[in-house]
Every structure is written in C-alpha cells, then in structure tokens.
From Swiss-Prot:
Gene3D superfamilies: Dihydrodipicolinate Reductase, domain 2, NAD(P)-binding Rossmann-like Domain. It holds the Pfam family Semialdhyde_dhC_1. This is N-acetyl-gamma-glutamyl-phosphate reductase. It comes from Prochlorococcus marinus (strain MIT 9313). GO terms for biological process: L-arginine biosynthetic process. Signal peptide: none annotated. Belongs to the NAGSA dehydrogenase family. Type 1 subfamily. Catalyzes the NADPH-dependent reduction of N-acetyl-5-glutamyl phosphate to yield N-acetyl-L-glutamate 5-semialdehyde. It catalyses: N-acetyl-L-glutamate 5-semialdehyde + phosphate + NADP(+) = N-acetyl-L-glutamyl 5-phosphate + NADPH + H(+). One of its GO terms (molecular function) is NAD binding.
Length: 357
C-alpha cells in the first residue's frame, strides 16, 4: 500500500458503512490512495476476511488505530467512527501533521458546550476540553465552505439530513427571500443511515413494508441544520425537523417548507435562484419546474438533485432534495473535502452518474 507522500489516506473505522464507501471511492481515485486501514474490533484480521466483496491490492491487515503509525503511513485520515471517538483520536493526529476529515458529529458544532448538550450520552463518558479545536474545525459542506475546507487541517463532514436540507434552503436564507420562522423539514431515509451495527428497528422484519417517524422533537440533526442556517441568514433560525425511516437500503429525500417574503415570486423565479447559486458546482443538479427528485436518481453518486415549487395561494415555498445518504450524505462528501484539501477539483475520482434502475 506504499504511495507517494501527499496522496496517502488512512481510513479509520474501515469496515463500517462510511469507511467502506470511502475505500470504494478511493480505490478508483487517480491521486489519493488508501495506505492504512484502522479499526478496533477488526484489528489483526486480513481485509479479505472482513470484506471479500471489496478486494484491496495486497490484502492488507486492519490495524488498531495508532497515531504514530497513522502519521507514518498517511497524510490524511478519514475518521468513520461512532460519535465520541473521533474527538479522542483527531487531536493526536493533528499534532502529528495528519489532516483529518471526520465523518462523525464530534466537530460539527463550533461550540463544545452545544455538542455536549446535543450528544449527552457520548459527552457523559468523556472529559472533552477541546474548545479551540471545535472553533477551528471547518464544516465540510463544499458548496458553501469550499475555500475554508481547502486550507483546513480538520474538516467536520455534515450529517446526511443536514446536507440534503441545507443545500436547497441556504440560497433563500442568504438572499432573504423567505421568512426565517415557520421553517419545516420533512425527511425520509433508508436503513443504512443507522450504520452497520445491528439495531432492532433496522431488522428486515421490523423495517419492511413500513414507514415510521423517529426523533420527532429534538433530533440531533435539528441543531446542526440550525447552526449553518443561522450563520448564512445572519440571525438565529429555529426550525422543525422530522425524519422518517422508509423500507429501502440507501437514499434520502428531504422536503423543506418555508414562506416567501415576496408573494409575486414564482417557481420559475426560485428555480433560477438555485441554478445561479449552484451553476459552478457540478455535484448539484437543479431540476426544471414540475420535475421532482427521486432517490433512485442519485443512487451511488455524489449528486444532490434539487427542485422547487411554489404554492401561490399562500406564498409557500416547497424545496425538495435527494441524495444518496452514504455518498453525498457521508463518504462521497468526505472525499469531496479531501479533494479540496489536496488541491484537486472537488469531483476528482467520483462518479456523478447514478446506477439506474
């Protein structure tokens, strides 16, 4: 797995869904290469034993994450770990000049105190005091934070729901085209969003032929969405967010409702707004009025597909967004951030074409 310095990537948490998708993307990457695989539970085992469906040259052994070893073999590290673990490893890597992309929520909040309030269970077992590091971490939404990501040492990749919700919403908050109150987000995602560790609600017998809301009030991603929405709007944003689990493996569809300040704006006007904002961002597609996104249209791709409609009876703006929760909603966005950090075009090594049907 030896590669030229400056292109070497460690993937920690390699056998989880986020790690697996990251490895799959980097195996086809022309410039970045996986040189270290880390994982506590899988340490000491050959890759082919763990993931025979994703062969890697030389069949490397998964290592117990060791900061010194990671720094020896990698220039970048993608951390695909449960919440509360990345914050223990990332500071050690940064001290050793390894640049980090964290796929967990550990550094998504600029305020450590807010993270502790939202992630209470994880926080009670930790003695975190990395206030400054939380402030320095860059929120990894490339379409809105590209220049900051390019020079960052620590990037906190957004959650899947925030990604799908913020991409259509932010342009209208930025330009002051919608009211800041009364925002509602209804989102639906597949079972892979729950990770690879077995959970009862994700069993086939539980999830099949059924749809259910969860985290109806106070879902962790609510405050994450509000944080960037407030920053872009220039004032505090409080919104309602409700996720739903649907019986499919991957895919996420978010519908955002807001009220237009100008009742004369049409769906065509609002579509023009989105197209103008994202015209130089190849990972974003804006559909014509009357065409609405489907999760199948983004499957296995790093695309986000957006659409707009307006109910002129009440000036209600309806924003729709589809992403693959494991790609643009997780690993693909992480690789997009890696590309920017490495001085590469953001889409390097990633397919923007879906597998249909």
């Amino acid at each position: 797995m030896s590669q030229v310095r400056g292109s070497r990537v460690a993937v920690i948490g390699a056998t989880g869904y986020g790690g697996l998708q990251t490895i799959r993307l980097l195996e086809d990457h022309p410039h970045l290469h996986v040189t270290y695989l880390g994982g506590e539970r899988s340490a000491g085992r050959r890759w082919s034993e763990l993931c025979p469906f994703l062969p890697i040259l030389d069949d490397p052994e998964v290592q117990s994450p060791d900061p010194d070893k990671i720094a020896e073999f990698a220039d970048y590290a993608v951390l695909s770990l449960p919440n509360g673990l990345a914050c223990q490893l990332a500071p050690q890597l940064l001290k050793r000049n390894v640049r980090v992309v964290d796929l967990s929520a550990d550094f998504r909040y600029r305020s450590l105190e807010q993270w502790k309030q939202v992630y209470v269970h994880e926080a009670q077992n930790l003695n975190r005091d990395d206030v400054q590091l939380c402030r320095e971490a860059v929120y990894g939404l490339p379409e809105w934070k590209g220049p900051e990501i390019a020079v960052a040492n620590l990037v906190a990749a957004p959650g899947c729901f925030p990604t799908a919700s913020l991409l259509p919403l932010l342009p209208f908050l930025k330009q002051g085209l919608i009211e800041n109150d009364g925002l509602i987000i209804d989102a639906k995602t597949g079972t892979s969003g729950g990770g690879r560790v077995a959970k009862e609600q994700f069993l086939l017998a539980e999830a099949s032929e059924s749809i259910m809301p969860y985290g109806v009030v106070g879902h962790r991603h609510t405050s994450e969405i509000e944080q960037l929405a407030s920053e872009v709007a220039g004032q505090p944003i409080e919104l309602q967010f409700t996720p739903h689990l649907v019986p499919m493996v991957r895919g996420l569809l978010a519908t955002v409702y807001g009220r237009l300040r100008d009742p004369g704006l049409t769906a065509e006007d609002c579509t023009t707004v989105l197209k103008a904002v994202y015209r130089h961002h190849p990972c974003i597609d804006v559909l014509p009025v009357g065409t609405y996104p489907a999760t199948k249209w983004v499957k296995y791709s790093n695309k986000a597909v957006l659409s707009v409609q307006v109910d002129n009876r009440n000036s209600r703006l309806v924003l729709m967004s589809a992403v693959d929760n494991l790609i643009k909603g997780q690993a693909g966005q992480g690789v997009q951030c890696l590309n920017l950090m490495a001085g590469l075009p953001p889409t390097t090594g990633m397919s923007l074409l879906t597998f249909y049907p």
